[in-house]
């Protein structure tokens, strides 16, 4: 795919799949806005990329942090939400704090990011939204209560966006990868 002349916000860019996508998209001509929690990792990544990249550190569990990031975005052609956290948790080892944290980042974080881009996409009737779900969002898996539930929510969000926007100029995609070892 050729991204020449296009500006994308890549959320969850500091490591793993997000970092790999940043390299691929930049090599394909995209000007990126890269976001994640670690500004240090983002600055290192920006230095590695062949095209210009704006660094905006944020915390997806904090609505104020995401809104502040949104204020610095400018015009975008698309957003790729690949951020996510996973902490193994079975029903027998219930950890409510970790379950809520996964939902805050993986699911609510997607809403917060979309809140920053949807107004401009709707105004122009143009944009590209890519949201990363997971194969674990299709059905329950052992040891993945918080993660699987949050990814099922993200997948439903993407499908609902697609249903509402499919006849518009806004393209919506969901990617549901299997297990990817990122650390």
Model-derived features: positions:
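Active-site loop immediately N-terminal to the catalytic Tyr-X3-Lys motif
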Residues: 92, 141-145
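Conserved glycine-rich Rossmann-like NAD(P)H-binding loop of the short-chain dehydrogenase/reductase
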Residues: 30-45
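Active-site helix of classical SDR
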Residues: 114, 150
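Conserved glycine-rich cofactor-binding loop
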Residues: 14-15
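Alpha-helical segment proximal to the catalytic Tyr-Lys
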Residues: 119, 163-164
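Substrate-binding pocket helix/loop in short-chain dehydrogenase/reductase
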Residues: 90-92, 98-103
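Residue(s) in the substrate-gating loop at a strand-loop-helix junction
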Residues: 134
């Amino acid at each position: 795919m050729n991204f020449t002349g296009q500006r994308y916000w890549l959320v969850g860019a500091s490591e793993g799949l997000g970092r790999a996508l940043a390299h691929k998209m930049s090599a394909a001509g995209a000007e990126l806005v890269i976001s994640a929690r670690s500004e240090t990792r983002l600055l290192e990544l920006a230095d590695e990329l062949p095209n210009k990249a704006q660094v905006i550190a944020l915390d997806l569990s904090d609505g104020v942090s995401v809104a502040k990031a949104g204020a610095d975005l400018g015009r975008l052609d698309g957003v790729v939400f690949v951020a996510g956290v996973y902490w193994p948790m079975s029903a027998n080892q219930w950890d409510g704090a970790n379950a809520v944290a996964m939902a805050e980042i993986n699911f609510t974080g997607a809403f917060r990011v979309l809140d920053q881009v949807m107004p401009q996409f709707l105004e122009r009737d143009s944009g590209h939204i890519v949201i990363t779900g997971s194969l674990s969002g299709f059905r329950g898996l052992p040891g993945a209560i918080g993660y699987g539930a949050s990814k099922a929510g993200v997948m439903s969000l993407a499908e609902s966006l697609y249903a509402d926007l499919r006849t518009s100029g806004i393209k919506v995609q969901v990617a549901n990868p299997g297990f990817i070892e990122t650390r």
